[in-house]
Amino acid sequence: MRLAAESSLVFFVSHFYFERFFSFVMVAYTLDTLFASDIDSATLFYSEGCGPIRLVALSAQMRRLVRLGPIRVAKACVEVRPMAPTKEFFEEGRQLQHIEAAGVGDFPDSERSGDTFVNPFTGRLTPTWGRVAKELFSLGFEHSIVNPFRLVWNPTKAALVSDAALQPFRTSTVTWRRNLAALLSRRDAADAVGEEIHRLYNEITSAYLPPKLDTMHDPRLSTMTMTPDQQNVIRCALRGYSMFIGGSAGTGKTVLLKAIHRKLTEMGLRVAMTATTGVASVQLGGCTFHLAFGVPIKGEEGTRKRWDSNAFRAVDVVIIDEVSLLDAELFETFEEEARMARLQQSPFGGLQVIACGDFLQLAMMDVSIGGPCYQSHAFRHLIPVCLVTSMRQAQGDPFCELLGQLRVGKFDKKAFKALDRPVSGDANNVTYIFPRRCDAQRLNDEKLCELRSEEMIFAPQRGPLQLVGNFTPAGLVDWGRKKDFPKREKIITVLSEEIKRITGVDIVDHNIVVMPAGGEKNAVLIRLRHSEDRNVLICKNGGSKEHGASNEGGAEESHWRAILEATAGRLKGKLHQIYNQDPHNFIPPSVSLMLADASLHPNAELISPLRLKLGCRVMINRNLSRTVSNGSVGIVEAFAAPNLDLFPRRHETSPKAFHTWSLERNGFQRLPIVRLLSGEVVQLPPLSVMIGGTPSTYFYGHELFVLPLQLGYGFTVHKVQGLTLEGTVVLDCKKFFECPHLVYVACSRVRSMDQLIVRNVRSDMIIVRQSALDFTNALRDASVMSSLDPPDGCTRASWVRRLSPLLVGLTD
């Protein structure tokens, strides 16, 4: 769609949500107020599917290019109308909130950082050409030279600020303006303003570590020996450099990431262990990249999801496995969002990013859309290295040489002819790999139907609805039948002011939860979210006490009640009651609907009932102990009552108690006993997966108890990427579709040629993406010490400054 615009108009796009529905309104504002020069034309580009929306204002110098995020616009929901800018637009910048929400990108860093900054008094992204910015600059504020996202106070201009200049701030109805006027009127303003700005920016970037980013160490690492190239990479990572770790299949990339995670966390750093696929995230013991940072899913209609700013601020290091499945545009957006969330201009906002993967394995489905990840500008901030020592196959093994040829696109007809042989031995020890999911599912169903033994169906058990995190008791505030029911933004503003007045603490907006009270038409439940070690309700004048101190409970309850009563009074409402636990009928029905949707889309496999029979072949899909891991296969020998002695042990101590909720509800009266190919016999307990717990569900969620098992006869190549398979593996390429590196990934899942059988393969199926091959060949050999010297201009993570005495150099 193309819109021709007059020279005095520029179009902004904003979106508003109501429950599950949304609409888009394009509003035109006069251009003369916003830009110093005329615009020749303005064009709005949008995608029918999931492409990004871009607003392009063209002049002689092409003044601005603002990307408004990957959201879908329905034609029927679009309205275009010109209107004049209002006073509130310039005073509050509310119409520009879409810039903060979606991020600012697609134009050079120097241009962007010079055009916008974060207002410390509102936490919003503010354009330098707007009225708010001009007023702040006139009062002595200016861009920080070190960090253009921030403002600094020039005390030499304090004497130049007159009472007349402050008068509009004193009489303003906006709270932050009045507070700023009072601050500038103080005798010690020269020092107080700078201190207040520093404190406010610290509040904006404050964060807590969410449970999804809390990853345990893998106890199996203590028995593993790192190769020389792995040790070199660890040394480089401990110096704070961002890196890309490449290497062929079986070179120990996942093991290396776990070792880096352990070293960095032992230094006191907070590390996000993520992967782009569910299988890879299970191998790491972390979570998916999209879940960790709230990545909006392309193509989802009506999505309300935004990047999780708290996650960016809560960690020091981000580890991303299987990064080849991220395209250049998404990786670029990730880097921009990190800088915006952390208010730092350095690459990734000062985060250390350790990406890992093999671009000669499976990548995203359509690389032509955004280009591979390594073609992004952000990827240049990573030191590229390559692991060269194989841990899956022995060096000099003919099979290792065959894989090396496949990796670069060479087809050995004689070798593959030898691999096309009949299956021998026990058919239960055979895993079939297919290019397409439907073929794998069909084989699993057929094999299960062939068995005439006892069958059991294990349906996932849902835990009770619960709040995920640490919260204050909820206060029920009611406005009866009054028509002037305040908006959520107004409630948050007044509540923040009362918390500041009573406790002396500033609260970040995202820690305030305002939830409609179920069937009550004009009532809300209000609570605060806080970290485990800090409860703002017992703070006074900026101080804090340890949670759990003496008489803390009484002080907390007293302060919280006073805050709620004052807030309700100012908003002409009434505080009815404070609940330690929300009444079930007060939880909005939309919460259950959202949780149902959250379960159906990303966790469809988890919520589907699992059918098992005695004698069926299964694969374990979680890392449960040193010897029972994701990819282990075995045969179901029995169904029996839970026996703790048969549960896999992650440590040498007694196994963790079985889920008490499951026992109480008798959700799993019998559990499968599996004999693994190694001979070990284990009983598989249900594991819990948390669904929800996000702002869209008012932080409500529930546990889903599922068995960490799946039928183990057939899988797709995409499903087993990153796994080492046991027993005989049969690859059937009969229904092959054009996909680079597919055959190489499938063949490299085993340790030896004796395990592999390949059928219906042809030379034209061996496809290698040339650009990926060129990139991989240019990687530095990690086994050579000098290759890890950082290039000129390579920056280190911001955590280096505070932990410099603990750093380990390459020469140590």
Curated annotation (Swiss-Prot):
PANTHER family: ATP-DEPENDENT DNA HELICASE (PTHR47642)
GO biological process: chromosome organization; DNA recombination; DNA repair; telomere maintenance
Species whose genome carries this gene: Trypanosoma brucei brucei (strain 927/4 GUTat10.1)
DNA-binding span(s): 741-761
Catalytic activity, as annotated: Couples ATP hydrolysis with the unwinding of duplex DNA at the replication fork by translocating in the 5'-3' direction. This creates two antiparallel DNA single strands (ssDNA). The leading ssDNA polymer is the template for DNA polymerase III holoenzyme which synthesizes a continuous strand; ATP + H2O = ADP + phosphate + H(+)
InterPro entries on file: AAA+_ATPase (IPR003593), DNA_helicase_pif1-like_DEAD (IPR010285), P-loop_NTPase (IPR027417), PIF1_helicase (IPR051055)
Protein name: ATP-dependent DNA helicase PIF3
Alphabetical UniProt keywords: ATP-binding, Cytoplasm, DNA damage, DNA recombination, DNA repair, DNA-binding, Helicase, Hydrolase, Isomerase, Nucleotide-binding
One MF term in the entry's GO annotations: ATP binding
Subunit-structure text: Monomer.
